[in-house]
């Protein structure tokens, strides 16, 4: 983490922490959505990160959400200062998968809006094929607003001399593409980013080992517990509950080496109640909720 007055040259900045529907969610008037409508501090944007290398004046976006215009404002001050007021186009975008909260912001880089020029988009082979062969995304490729760069899971890519990223596959609903997670490495520290996964048991890796190998972990926290789904078939939920993840990762959290935050929060999530038992439990167990604007120094 960074605090006011600290100097950090390589950062991961959290730009969005909600599930794909955002908070408030369209057409929903639950207490969490109503609270967000009445008080902007409870608004949450769709899932996204920025990777900032201030030494190289480079900025990369992880997942182009439909809130990308607002999310640019969260990096504007740092990057405008670093870039000498140049046009604030990212140096690349990395995509996890083809669900609406994670890639549809690409449309704003097209002819009708920012009109980017060969903006590198890093993604899996299947994701790249989806973009190239389906409109309106194929127009971005045709007009060379974006340039697709395929990621090979398990292989590092170098974004700047001080930043590298390793992608890996995770199990998830893969209607149009497969799903990736990322390890983002700076010169000193590393971040694990898994906003979507079917379950930790369904993965062919040990989540405890993966978390303990990094300094920060931003993990799928879509739902807090089965209480959000009375009468529902829990096998169809498709995300690990925060309560389950905390039970799995409690020994890791107690060690204190890795800071663990939950992100990708659904509007129904019990942890969104600032005075509720869920957020108290999360905090008392040594975990946290990711917040827009939060910076992780690498």
Which residues does each PLM region occupy?
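Structured loop/turn residues at beta-strand edges in well-structured enzyme cores
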Residues: 88, 101, 117, 144, ...
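Core dinuclear metal-dependent hydrolase active-site scaffold
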Residues: 3-77, 81-84, 148-210, 294-298
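Active-site metal-binding motif and surrounding structural segment of the metallo-beta-lactamase
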Residues: 55-61, 65-122, 215
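A short, active-site helix/loop in glycosyltransferases that binds the activated sugar's phosphate group
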Residues: 126-136
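A short helix-to-beta-strand connector/capping loop
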Residues: 8, 117, 141-147, 160-163, ...
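Active-site neighborhood of phospho(di)ester-bond hydrolases with catalytic His/Asp-centered motifs
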Residues: 61-65, 89-102, 122-124, 192-198, ...
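Short glycine-/acidic-enriched loop or helix-start segments at secondary-structure transitions
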Residues: 24, 71-73, 104-106, 132-133, ...
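Cap/insert and terminal regions of metallo-dependent hydrolase folds
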Residues: 190, 198-295
């Amino acid at each position: 983490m960074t605090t006011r007055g600290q100097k950090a040259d390589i950062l991961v900045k959290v730009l969005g922490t909600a599930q794909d529907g955002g908070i408030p969610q369209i057409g929903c008037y639950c207490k969490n959505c109503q609270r967000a409508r009445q008080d902007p501090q409870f608004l949450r944007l769709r899932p996204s990160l920025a990777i900032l290398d201030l030494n190289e004046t480079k900025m990369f976006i992880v997942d182009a959400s439909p809130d990308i215009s607002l999310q640019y404002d969260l990096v504007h001050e740092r990057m405008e200062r670093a870039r000498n007021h140049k046009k604030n186009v990212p140096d690349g975008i990395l995509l996890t998968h083809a669900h609406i909260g994670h890639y549809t912001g690409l449309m704003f880089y097209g002819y009708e809006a920012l009109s980017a020029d060969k903006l590198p988009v890093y993604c899996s082979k299947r994701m790249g094929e989806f973009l190239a062969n389906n409109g309106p995304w194929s127009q971005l490729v045709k007009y060379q607003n974006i340039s697709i760069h395929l990621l090979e899971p398990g292989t590092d890519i170098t974004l700047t001399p001080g930043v590298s990223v390793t992608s890996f596959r995770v199990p998830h609903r893969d209607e149009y593409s497969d799903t990736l997670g990322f390890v983002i490495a700076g010169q000193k520290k590393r971040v694990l980013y898994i906003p979507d996964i079917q379950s930790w048991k369904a993965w062919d890796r040990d989540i405890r080992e993966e978390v303990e190998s990094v300094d920060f972990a931003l993990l799928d926290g879509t739902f807090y517990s089965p209480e959000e789904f009375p009468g529902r078939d829990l096998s169809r939920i498709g995300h690990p509950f925060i309560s389950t993840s905390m039970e799995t990762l409690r020994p890791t959290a107690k060690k204190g080496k890795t800071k663990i935050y939950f992100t990708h929060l659904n509007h129904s999530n019990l942890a969104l109640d600032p005075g509720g038992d869920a957020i108290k439990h999360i905090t008392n167990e040594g975990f946290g909720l990711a917040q827009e604007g939060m910076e992780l120094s690498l």
